[in-house]
UniProtKB/Swiss-Prot annotation:
Protein name (record): Adenylosuccinate synthetase
Source species of the chain: Marinomonas sp. (strain MWYL1)
Main enzyme class: ligase
Record keywords, A-Z: Cytoplasm, GTP-binding, Ligase, Magnesium, Metal-binding, Nucleotide-binding, Purine biosynthesis
Gene: purA
Signal peptide range: none
SMART domains: Adenylsucc_synt (SM00788)
Length: 432
């Protein structure tokens, strides 16, 4: 009987999901994206060669693995085409391996224009969006005016819907934001060309998934961003526009929740965040600079440097609860090599030193939180390439055990380097 596993980030994204997904695709028949868009960045390093994907599931490099983009993803046709062509140049048969739901809302030029105009208007209160139209595309979905992949394949339906939605967007762009309108002819012509490119990849993804399930195949659901960026459960409003938590997998694919067997939470051995928003354990000293330098903390999508801080057990406990995390994959443990002291946030206090209890539901709560730390001894030995848990330095083992106690779930996988063979698999989610 097959296993159906959700893999997602438990922090603010950039946890190293791409490498872990690629490692575990050895055992799967399909990898499925269920939310987000091309604002995600998945970096894969195989035999020293780096491939960065933003939209296509990380399993695309694996022969025999079907990659599926589910209905919960907002799809930029231009971004998808660029990725597919790059993969084809590398000899990867991306068109054959990729299937796309006809129900995916499209990201079109007016979404990008409104996204960038709004962020500019916010000034110092900007949210930190990538400016790629993700949020506005999700707005259209909820407002029931989205143009979806299936609409694009019908030229008359596409023209009718595009005319209607452009009237709305061009009014807002010109009258409120005082920027140039978007040309109907340009969007329509480009859309028709893109329709023919997409057509071979569009499929009934719900039936495809359930056929795989009935056949006893292993299926992986690949999350984008991180749990603390979830539109409902993250540091609102400094969040993304989709449900990045495990509940997004059933909704974003049409795969019933009771068919899911395991949730793997990808977690850095420290904490990072890109862009604006609260970050209780953020460091502004040499320790923070060292983590960023050793961890090469620059966003795969934006190139922006990431803010760095110590491990936050409080935020992790929250992520474990809202995702029903079965086990953790701890990444970038090697970045802590050479640290004399490592701090772990075990609780929050307010400005007066009083304990903060319960779950925080917005950015105001997180901004008032002050981290309460426990100091643990570091290690001087290298963890890179360690082949099993016992081969890790004693203090590294103790650090991992402490984190397990704090968050209440086991560390099932440990990443000690960027290459997929630099990984300790204690318990494989697909073989339990």
């Amino acid at each position: 009987m097959g296993k159906n596993v959700v893999i997602l980030g438990t922090q603010w994204g950039d946890e190293g999901k791409g490498k872990v997904v690629d490692l575990l695709t050895e055992d799967v028949a399909a990898v499925v994206r269920f939310q987000g868009g091309h604002n995600a960045g998945h970096t894969l390093v195989i035999d020293g060669k780096k491939t960065v994907l933003h939209l296509i599931p990380s399993g695309i490099l694996r022969e025999g693995v079907q990659c599926i983009i589910g209905n919960g993803v907002v799809l930029s046709p231009a971004a998808l085409k660029a990725e597919v062509l790059e993969l084809l140049e590398q000899g990867v048969p991306a068109v054959d391996r990729l299937k796309i739901s006809a129900a995916c809302p499209l990201i079109l030029p007016y979404h990008i224009a409104i996204d960038q105009a709004r962020e500019l208007a916010r000034g110092e209160k900007k949210i930190g969006t990538t400016g790629r139209g993700i949020g506005p595309a999700y707005e259209d979905k909820v407002a029931r005016r989205a143009i979806r992949v299936g609409d694009l394949l019908d030229s008359e339906r596409f023209a009718s819907k595009l005319k209607e939605v452009l009237e709305y967007y061009n009014f807002v762009l010109t009258q409120y934001h005082k920027v140039e309108p978007i040309s109907f002819d340009e969007v329509y012509t480009a859309g028709l060309e893109m329709a023919e490119f997409l057509r071979p990849m569009v499929a009934d993804t719900i039936t495809l998934l359930h056929d795989l399930r009935k056949a006893g195949a292993n299926i992986m659901f690949e999350g984008a961003q991180g749990s603390l960026l979830d539109v409902d459960h993250g540091t609102y409003p400094y969040v993304t526009s989709s449900n990045t938590t495990a509940g997004g997998a059933p909704a974003g694919t049409g795969f019933g929740p009771l068919y899911l067997d395991y949730v793997l939470g990808i977690t850095k051995a420290y904490t990072t965040r890109v862009g604006s928003g609260p970050f209780p354990t953020e460091l502004f000293d040499e320790d923070g600079e060292r983590l960023g330098r050793r961890g090469h903390e620059f966003g795969a999508t934006t190139g922006r440097s990431r803010r760095c801080g110590w491990f936050d057990s409080v935020a992790l406990r929250h992520a474990v609860q809202i995702n029903s995390v079965s086990g953790i994959c701890l990444t970038k443990l090697d970045v802590l090599d050479g640290s004399s002291v490592i701090k772990v946030c075990v609780s929050y206090a307010d400005e007066n030193g009083n304990p903060v209890a319960g779950s925080l539901v917005d950015s105001e709560g997180y901004e008032k939180a002050r981290p309460v730390y426990v100091e643990l001894p570091g290690w001087t030995e290298s963890t890179v390439g360690a082949e099993n848990f016992e081969a890790l330095p004693k203090n590294a083992q103790d650090y991992i055990r402490f984190l397990e106690e704090q968050v209440g779930v086991p560390v099932d996988i440990i990443s000690t380097g960027p290459d997929r063979n630099e990984t300790i698999v204690i318990r494989d989610p697909f073989k339990q």
